[in-house]
Amino acid sequence: MIIKNKEVKDILIKCGWQESRTANISHYLDWYKKYNFKPFDAVPDFLSCFGGLTLRIPSYRYMKRISSPKNNSDLELEVIVNPAFFITDDFSSEDIIESKQYAKDIGDFLGIENLIPVGSSSEYEEFFMGIN
């Protein structure tokens, strides 16, 4: 994948990414199948480029503000590109149903038919891809 923005590219490279990166995503595809998610074409492409990486994204707020954050952890957001954090092996069947409904509800709210989990943050935020 070609990233044209130098600042974004530098951040990705610091996190272990490279333009020629092609990660083995078979375990992610197995996970989607296990939980009956139907990823569209862009999802495997995205995971092939970024799957397994932990991205440390600088907080734009503190890049532009004069004041400093209360905690150094506020200086960046850590995003783990791994859909399997959305539903883990220790989830009960009720947890799985609730998680899948949560993804559907978000998609419905945003007007997105097929919302697919792709990662999470250290702050327990989920990241999705979708098409509309």
Predicted segments, located by residue:
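A surface-exposed partner-binding patch
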Residues: M1-E125
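Segments surrounding the PLD/"HKD" phosphodiesterase catalytic module and close analogs
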Residues: E126-N132
